[in-house]
């Protein structure tokens, strides 16, 4: 049997809509991600378990893990009879790359089970394709960091899908999931079809400056450039209490904050553990909406998807 863990990810990071994402892991050792197990069987079977298994589609063929198995078999040109188990530990529609976790874990597990017939680039292309079935368009800003680890910039040129951007060891990512669902497709539909020239210029300046600051090792500058003129002005209305939360975490000392992915998770970036804890405490009291919500203090997950059994 092969068991693969795929970590949560925070896409966009305010500054890089659809082209930037970071894999994250809680500092307390909690596993924030999905696990998929694969073993040989006489015919295909899929079993779901985990905290959020009851939120999955009741029809097995609608489960993204089934679709991953089906697409992987197509890529190999043969049917591979396996029993798969999805441990769904990630809330659906959370802005933490929940579907990417399932897609990445499933495809890596299948590839490991079959002796790695597909290389990383081919696997990543399949991951983007399958993630696109859920979100409505192919994009790699969750699947790439989830699969490869660290902070990833989408390239999509010369056969290169993404490349790693150096992060900062001192950065702590406070992630607050309020417990409500925001559909990725809905969050994309709310965005305008066209943008003003000044917004395009500002977006280009912020993203170019952020990447420069990462490579020139200027964490304060990098954090200051994490501004969103593309999605946040339109998506903030989908998130109860978001504007107040951003103001509060800034006053506490967060370097930057914004919407993780398409929301509703909020991320806040800190460079001191005590600041991160104060931010986490405030968000726990004021941003969470129900018992399904949670707050984690995280660092970059540099390993990405890995075999755990």
From Swiss-Prot:
Coiled coil: none annotated. Its EC number is 2.7.1.39. ATP binds at residues 91-101. It is found in: Cytoplasm. Pfam families: GHMP_kinases_C (PF08544), GHMP_kinases_N (PF00288). Transmembrane segments: none annotated. One of its GO terms (biological process) is threonine biosynthetic process. Keywords: Amino-acid biosynthesis, ATP-binding, Cytoplasm, Kinase, Nucleotide-binding, Threonine biosynthesis, Transferase. One of its GO terms (molecular function) is homoserine kinase activity. SUPFAM superfamilies: GHMP Kinase, C-terminal domain (SSF55060), Ribosomal protein S5 domain 2-like (SSF54211). It catalyses: L-homoserine + ATP = O-phospho-L-homoserine + ADP + H(+). One of its GO terms (cellular component) is cytoplasm. Pathway: Amino-acid biosynthesis; L-threonine biosynthesis; L-threonine from L-aspartate: step 4/5. Catalyzes the ATP-dependent phosphorylation of L-homoserine to L-homoserine phosphate. Belongs to the GHMP kinase family. Homoserine kinase subfamily. This is Homoserine kinase. It comes from Salmonella typhimurium (strain LT2 / SGSC1412 / ATCC 700720). The lineage of its organism: Bacteria, Pseudomonadati, Pseudomonadota, Gammaproteobacteria, Enterobacterales. The gene is thrB.
